Curated annotation (Swiss-Prot):
Serves a reserve supply of oxygen and facilitates the movement of oxygen within muscles. It comes from Haliotis madaka. This is Myoglobin. The keyword 4Fe-4S does not apply. It comes from the Eukaryota. The lineage of its organism: Eukaryota, Metazoa, Spiralia, Lophotrochozoa, Mollusca.
Length: 378
C-alpha cells in the first residue's frame, strides 16, 4: 500500500482543496486588477467593462509575492477575461484578448501550472473563503445574488468534503497498516461527509433558478475553440502568440472531490469516460492532479484490502460509503437535469466542459459514471 499523506498535496484536513483564507486584494501596484475584478458585475451590466479593460495598464506579474498572491491574481485575471469576452453574450464574443490581460495571465498561469482560463480552482477554491464555518464569496461574476449563490454552494460542497480529510487519511493509513478498525471508522466518517455534500448541493435550490444558471451564469464559464464554442476558432492571447488557443469551459466537474472518491474507493470507468475525467485534471492545480494520479495508481487498491480481510464490519462500512457516493452522484444528475437539460429547453443543451470535448451524451455519461460507482459494492 502506497503512503499517501494529504498534506503532501496541499490538501487540508479541515477545508480540503479550498485555499486557506487570503487577502481579498493584491498590493497597491496591482490596484487596476483589484478594481476591475471587483467592479466586473456592474461594469458588464452597463456594457462598459470591455472599454475599461482596454484602458488597463500592462502590469508586471513578477512583482507578485508567493503562491497565494499568484492564485488571487489568477482569479482576478480570469474573471477579467471572462467579463471581457462575454460582456455582449455568446453572440457578441470577441476572439482576441488584449495584452494587458493576456500576458500577465499567461505568465502567472505558467508559474502556477494552471491553465490561462477560468477554472473551478479560481471561482471556487480561491474565491470561497471559509469564515466561521460558512463560505464567503470574494469576487462575483455578473448576475447578482443568484450567481453569488451558485459560487457559494460550490464552496459549501467543497467544505463539506474538506472536513472528511481525516477520514480519508484514516482509510489510507488503515489500509497500509492492515488496521481494520481504523479503515472502518474512516469509511463511516466519510459516509457522513458525503451525505453532508449532498445536503450542501441541495441548497442550490434555495436561491438559484434554472433560467438564471443556464442563461446568466453558464455563458460566463464558456471555454473557447471547438465546434460547440461561440469562439470556435479559439482565442488569441495578444502579446503571447498569434496562434489561437483552445480551452475547455469552467465547470464544477473540475472539482477533485469525486475523483478522489473514485481513486480511494477503487472505482474505475471505461477508457472513453476516463479520458474526459483525465482531461479535466489538466484544469486542476498540479498538486491536486498529482494526488489523483497517486490514488489511481495505488498498487493495492482499497476494495482489495477490504475483500482480503473478510471482515463483516469493515465490508459493511465500505459498502455504506459506496452507497452514499452512488446516491450523491444520482442527486447530482438531478441537479444537472434541472439546471441544464430542462433549462435549455432544447434537445442539445449547452453543457459546461463536456460539450467542449465534442460530446453531447451528457446524462448517459453521468449515469454510466454513477453505475460504475455501484459496481465496487461487495
Ligand atoms: C448548478 C449546479 C451544477 C450543475 C448545473 C452541474 C453540471 C455539471 C455538468 C454539465 C457536468 C458534466 C461535465 C461538464 O460538462 O462540465 C458535471 C459534472 C461534474 N460535476 Fe457538476 N454541476 C453542478 C454542481 C456541482 C457541484 C457543486 C460540484 C462539486 C463541488 C460538482 C461536481 C461535478 C463533478 C466532480 C463532475 C464530474 C462527473 C462525476 O464525477 O460524476 N457539480 N456537472
Amino acid at each position: 500500500m502506497a503512503d499517501i499523506q494529504l498534506s503532501k498535496y496541499h490538501v487540508s484536513k479541515d477545508i480540503g482543496f479550498l485555499l486557506e483564507p487570503l487577502q481579498d486584494v493584491l498590493p497597491d501596484y496591482f490596484e487596476p486588477w483589484n478594481r476591475l475584478a471587483k467592479s466586473l458585475p456592474e461594469l458588464v451590466a452597463s456594457h462598459k467593462f470591455r472599454d475599461a479593460v482596454k484602458e488597463m495598464p500592462l502590469l508586471d506579474q513578477s512583482k507578485l509575492a508567493g503562491y497565494r498572491q499568484k492564485r488571487l491574481a489568477h482569479l482576478q485575471l480570469v474573471l477579467i477575461t471572462s467579463g471581457y469576452l462575454w460582456q455582449e453574450g455568446e453572440g457578441g464574443a470577441v476572439q482576441r484578448l488584449p495584452e494587458c490581460v493576456s500576458k500577465p495571465l499567461w505568465n502567472v498561469s505558467n508559474d502556477l501550472g494552471l491553465k490561462p482560463v477560468l477554472t473551478f480552482a479560481d471561482i471556487c477554491l480561491t474565491n470561497c473563503k471559509v469564515k466561521n464555518g460558512d463560505i464567503e464569496v470574494m469576487y462575483n461574476l455578473p448576475g447578482g445574488a443568484g450567481t453569488e449563490w451558485f459560487l457559494k454552494v460550490c464552496g459549501l460542497v467543497e467544505l463539506a468534503f474538506g472536513k472528511s480529510g481525516q477520514a480519508i487519511q484514516n482509510v489510507l493509513d488503515g489500509a497500509k497498516a492492515n488496521d481494520k478498525a481504523k479503515m472502518a471508522s474512516g469509511f463511516t466518517d466519510l459516509t457522513a461527509a458525503i451525505g453532508n455534500m449532498q445536503t450542501a448541493l441541495a441548497r442550490m435550490n434555495e436561491n438559484l433558478t434554472p433560467e438564471h444558471f443556464y442563461n446568466g451564469v453558464r455563458p460566463f464559464l464558456n471555454g473557447f475553440g471547438g465546434p460547440a464554442s461561440p469562439i470556435s476558432g479559439g482565442l488569441v492571447y495578444e502579446g503571447v502568440s498569434d496562434k489561437p488557443v483552445t480551452m475547455i469551459g469552467g465547470s464544477a466537474a473540475q472539482s477533485s472531490t469525486m475523483q478522489v472518491l473514485d481513486g480511494l474507493l477503487g472505482i474505475t470507468h471505461s477508457p472513453e469516460k476516463q479520458a474526459f475525467l483525465d482531461e479535466i485534471r489538466n484544469y486542476m492545480p498540479p498538486s491536486h492532479k498529482q494526488m489523483l494520479a497517486d490514488l489511481t495508481n495505488m498498487p493495492r487498491k482499497v476494495p482489495q484490502v477490504v475483500a482480503e480481510t473478510k471482515d463483516a464490519n469493515l465490508t459493511k462500512a465500505f459498502n455504506g460509503c459506496v452507497a452514499a457516493f452512488v446516491q450523491y452522484r444520482s442527486y447530482h444528475i438531478q441537479v444537472v437535469t434541472k439546471y441544464i437539460v430542462t433549462a435549455s429547453k432544447s434537445d442539445s443543451p449547452k453543457s459546461l466542459a463536456y460539450k467542449d470535448t465534442g460530446k453531447s451524451d451528457l446524462i448517459p455519461f453521468l449515469k454510466e459514471v454513477r453505475d460504475d460507482t455501484e459496481k465496487v459494492q461487495q
